[in-house]
Amino acid sequence: MSPDEYCQNKAAASGSSFYYSFLFLPAEQRRAIMALYAFCREVDDVVDECSDRDVARRKLDWWREETAACFAGQPRHPVTSALAPVLDSYNLPVEYFQEIIDGMNMDLEQQRYESFSELALYCHRVAGIVGLLSAEIFGYQHRDTLKYAESLGTAFQLTNIIRDVREDAERGRIYLPLDELLEYRINPHDLLNGEINDALPALLSVQAERANSYYQRALEQLPEQDRYAQRSGLVMTAIYQTLLSEIQADGYRVMRHRIRLTPLRKLWIAWTTARRERRRHRQYLKTPAHA
């Protein structure tokens, strides 16, 4: 199996919505973003699948070393072997990859967040940075696109936090800000014990409003001239906002079950969004400034 095939299998096997957003990219960009996504999956799996924190720390340290080796032209892992040639084509700073690992390390060292300002740093590291790297791969002309990419990454992460409240609690993690839990009189230990608090839907509604504000901010920050190049992010936005709407329609009962979109529905959303953005781009090219 080639490094590229390894990364593609990693992305497809995860069942992630991101996979569907990559399907409409040119081959070179698709290979690059698959390698980036596979890297994120590998380091995320370290903290999600390793029950011994000391072992997880050592594995993350190994990935730090492997990342440095990749940028030095000496990759050993299939993921970094797929990433290495990508580094010659795109502006992907090594510091960004190290910061992603820093974010994963926060899952080991900090499993509570006193306020949203603390949580925002975590979102920046594990998702905002990924957005910035993705924007470099997709391409852009205006630097405001980087603001869009980081805001969008945070929006995705906030959506994940809402969806995964129960699963995260089962791992001993609470991403809902503690000051907001206190405001709604929700005991963090109740979440950890899987107990259902009647006030949780109201709190999650506030979290959803915050996530939607980041989606809106991101779309407002995206220059029209870069919109088509960044269409994968727009595909993901459509999928994730649909997911968030489904969670809302279900009454935020995330402690009872996990809301999912079927693969067919994700594919349909991805295809229709990509087609809509292609039509919009054609109209943009017909404007007087570009005709």
Residue ranges of each PLM-predicted region?
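Catalytic cores of Mg2+-dependent Asp-rich isoprenoid enzymes
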Residues: 1-157, 162, 166-291
